Swiss-Prot record:
Gene transcribed to yield this protein: nifV
Catalytic activity: acetyl-CoA + 2-oxoglutarate + H2O = (2R)-homocitrate + CoA + H(+)
Name of the protein: Homocitrate synthase
Family indicated by similarity: Belongs to the alpha-IPM synthase/homocitrate synthase family.
Residue ranges annotated for the Pyruvate carboxyltransferase domain, each copy included: 18-269
GO BP annotations, alphabetical order: biosynthetic process; carboxylic acid metabolic process; nitrogen fixation
């Protein structure tokens, strides 16, 4: 297999506390309406690697020969990247995974009684008996195995502990705890992962969905409880409400848990734009780290403080992702903000001019439902300096 570098090591043998196994190309593409072209999958994979992602869940052979061809192309393009395929309990899919050069195969096992009965129609002893030759096959073909515990969040702890014992006996190196329906909270996630950790000493991967808006929080809780690997998708793409977002998870691991996951944050904005374009999605202006307005400030109190010290109302330095903070005028601006921003643009306003400007800015924001741009602020300043009719008067004259 192509990737021989230890999965616990980053560039230059730098120890890595958490391994990102990004599944944008597999689970992310399962978002309704998302279908990446072959060229887009190649671009996304390369951009993920450029950003420091060390493992890719690259796809599933169950989609057919075209998917297998794309997986083989990915393998050739990125020979040093650890790649995993997602498979059902199906020998043909395991053979296909080896044929296209996958390093790992995630063999999905329905862990809850509900899914096991609905999908496999067999009791646990029969399921385990079927799993054993599949794991042996993967090993003979030169792949490492992750047991993907599908719907683990609805499985009993006793069942997961039994599966951990089976995994150890079969030489499986990693277990995936999948909150498939996104029903856990950080507290229950910590409890469940901690309990599993008492029975499993290999790699442990958290796969969190965002149905309750807690995928990132649940991922961090799992890491606190002992997870060594985390699944992410760019922009949180995925089934239903999506998965844990790469950009949020990696920033939170860095800032909240002080853990290194090898990510170059300056690469994330371009990566997110690339994936958004390929997925036909827009990036919300308030999306953490990469949204257009996440480093923009309007509130008068905040702007006044930021003009004195940028640290006052910024917990994340925008230079982390190659950006700068932006101060704008709007309905919530105050006199100091107006005076300070206008001064930055080269206009020193009197107290009367500042008050008139403040009224004009508020009217502008209410009328146009946006902040005035820099050119518009300059025009307003020039009008104040020239004692021209204010914007409010223009609106009244136009019947506004």
């Amino acid at each position: 297999m192509a990737a021989s570098e230890s999965e616990r090591t980053g560039g230059g043998n730098r120890p890595m506390a958490v391994i990102i196994n990004d599944t944008t190309l597999r689970d992310g593409e399962q978002s309704p309406g998302v279908a990446f072209r072959a060229s887009e999958k190649l671009e996304i994979a390369q951009a993920l690697v450029n950003a420091g992602v060390r493992e890719l869940e690259a796809g599933t052979p169950a989609l057919g020969e075209e998917e297998c061809v794309r997986l083989a192309i990915l393998r050739r393009q990125l020979p040093d990247t650890v790649m995993m395929s997602w498979c059902r309990m199906n020998s043909a899919e395991i053979h296909d995974s080896a044929r296209v050069g996958m390093d790992w195969v995630d063999i999905s096992v329905p862990a809850s009684d509900l899914l096991r009965e609905q999908k496999l129609h067999r009791p646990w002893p029969a399921v385990i008996a079927s799993l054993k030759p599949l794991v042996q096959l993967a090993h003979r073909l030169g792949m490492r195995v992750c047991m993907g515990c599908e719907d683990a969040s609805r499985s009993a702890d006793e069942t997961l502990h039994m599966l951990a014992e089976v995994a150890a006996d079969l030489g499986i190196e990693r277990m995936r705890f999948a909150d498939t329906l996104g029903i856990l909270d950080p507290f229950s996630t910590f409890t469940r992962i901690s309990a599993l950790r008492q029975h499993w000493h290999g790699g442990l991967e958290i796969h969190a969905h965002n149905d309750l808006g807690m995928a990132t929080a649940n991922t961090l809780a799992a890491v606190r409880a002992g997870a060594t690997h985390v699944n992410t998708t760019v922009l949180g793409l995925g089934e239903r409400a999506g998965n844990a977002a790469l950009e949020s998870v990696t920033l939170s691991l860095d800032r909240c848990l002080h853990l290194d996951c090898g990510i170059d944050f300056t690469e994330l904005p371009a990566l997110c734009r690339l994936v958004a374009a390929a997925a036909g999605r827009t990036i919300d202006v308030q999306h953490p780290l990469v949204g257009g307005q996440v480093f923009t400030h309007e509130s008068g109190l905040h702007v006044a403080a930021l003009l004195r010290d940028p640290r006052s109302y910024q917990g994340i330095d925008p230079s982390l992702v190659g950006r700068e903070f932006n101060l704008v005028l709007g309905k919530h601006s105050g006199r100091q903000a107006v005076s300070g921003i206008c001064a930055r643009l080269g206009y020193i306003l009197s107290e009367t001019q500042t008050l008139l400007m403040l009224q004009e800015v508020k009217r502008f924001a209410e009328h146009f439902k946006r902040n005035p741009g820099e050119d518009e602020v300059i025009a307003m300043c020039q009008m104040r300096m020239d004692d021209q009719i204010p914007f409010e008067g223009q609106l009244q004259a136009q019947g506004g």
